[in-house]
Amino acid sequence: GGVGRNIAHNMRLLGVPTYLLTAVGSDSRASQVEQSCRDLGIDLSHALHVPDGRTSTYVFVGDSDGDMAIAVSDMEICKKLTPDYFASQLDLLNGAAAVVVDANLPRESIAYLTEHCTVPVFIDPVSTVKAEKLHGLLGRVHTLKPNRIEAELLSGVKITDDASLHKAAEALLAQGLQR
């Protein structure tokens, strides 16, 4: 699993050629992720392999609103996905139809991608905690896929009905977001 891997999975189910730029360790979890990606046709040839690293693990319990109530995770390896790593992949990224980013990446990497990718950048905020990283970056993002709580956080608008939902969307668009 993982947000990025799950998005890649769904893109492949739609028949879209998909590269997953991620970091994997040298543990059994890496083997599971690599095998599941191979089975789906997700290209991991540009993934960062971290010797002696632990592939990220995340267990999530959602609240009644669908946001994170409690989670246990080991996401340390995500810190290896630096702007330098993405700079080395920039030709691949800019040759794609779009780049999809999840907010598990370090903020500086998200900022790098939104600044240097010449194709549309789509972002999944992942959670309210991770969505905080996106403040100040939305003007360089094509499409945002927030849930209600993430949209409230990023727009500053409490969403209680259709009218406030539209107001939140307008506030996000006013920050430069395209969708």
What are these regions, as identified by a protein language model?
Residues 1-4:
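Short catalytic helix/loop segments, enriched in acidic residues and glycine
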Residues 13-97:
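Conserved N-terminal subdomain of the carbohydrate kinase-like
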Residues 26-27, 103-107, 125-129:
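Short beta->alpha connector loops
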Residues 30, 107-111, 130-134:
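Short, well-ordered alpha-helical microsegments
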Residues 72, 98-100, 122, 145:
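Structural motif
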Residues 76-80, 107, 128-131, 153:
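Short, small-residue-enriched loops and turns at beta-alpha junctions
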Residues 116-121, 125-179:
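Conserved phosphate/ATP/ADP-binding segment of small-molecule kinases
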